[in-house]
UniProtKB/Swiss-Prot annotation:
It is found in: Cytoplasm. HAMAP family: RimP. This is Ribosome maturation factor RimP. The gene is rimP. One of its GO terms (biological process) is ribosomal small subunit assembly. Pfam families: DUF150_C (PF17384), RimP_N (PF02576).
Length: 162
C-alpha cells in the first residue's frame, strides 16, 4: 500500500483527514491533519502520532522522525472538497498556466459549479478593470492556500463551513 493511502486509511478510521504529506531530508515525515467539524488541537496531533507510529512499525515504513501538525491558518487547498468547504473564504491561487498573462490570484472562493467530474471553482478578485470572476478546475491549480484571517475577538474564520 502506498504511504499516503496507508496514512489516509488510518486517519479516516480515527475521524481525521489527511491534508498534506511531506517527506523531508534526514528521514523526517510530516503529516498535516484536519478534522472539519472541530479543527485540530495538540491532543489530536499526539493521538495521531501514536497511532501512526504503531502502524508504521507494523507496515515497516522507513522514517527517522514523525511530525504531526494542523495545516495552519494558511491551510492548503488540494481537493474539490476543500474548495467546497471553504467557499466564501479568501484564498491565494496559483494556476499551472497563465490566464491573460497572470498565474497568481487572490480573492473570494465561490461554490464549485458544473456536472460531477467537470466542476469549475469560482474566485472573485479585483481585476485591472474592477471586480472579476475567474473559473478553473482543481486540475488547473498549481498551489492554493487560504489567506490567514486572525480575529482576536474569538470568532470563526469567515466562510468556513464548520
Amino acid at each position: 500500500m502506498h504511504l499516503a493511502d496507508l496514512i489516509e486509511t488510518t486517519l479516516s478510521g480515527m475521524g481525521y483527514e489527511l491534508v498534506e504529506l511531506e517527506r523531508a531530508p534526514a528521514g523526517l515525515l510530516r503529516v498535516y491533519i484536519d478534522q472539519p467539524e472541530t479543527g485540530i488541537a495538540i491532543e489530536d496531533c499526539e493521538k495521531v502520532s501514536r497511532q501512526l507510529t504503531h502502524v508504521f512499525t507494523v507496515e515497516n515504513v522507513d522514517y527517522e522522525r514523525l511530525e504531526v501538525s494542523s495545516p495552519g491558518l494558511d491551510r492548503p487547498l488540494k481537493k474539490l472538497a476543500d474548495f467546497v468547504r471553504f467557499a466564501g473564504a479568501e484564498a491565494r491561487v496559483t494556476l499551472r498556466l497563465p490566464v491573460n498573462g497572470q498565474k497568481n490570484f487572490t480573492g473570494i472562493l465561490r461554490e464549485p459549479t458544473g456536472a460531477a467530474g467537470e466542476e469549475k471553482i469560482g474566485l472573485e478578485f479585483e481585476g485591472k478593470d474592477g471586480p472579476a470572476l475567474l473559473e478553473f478546475a482543481v486540475s488547473d491549480v498549481d498551489k492554493a492556500r487560504l489567506v490567514p484571517v486572525i480575529d482576536f475577538k474569538g470568532n470563526q474564520r469567515k466562510g468556513n463551513k464548520q
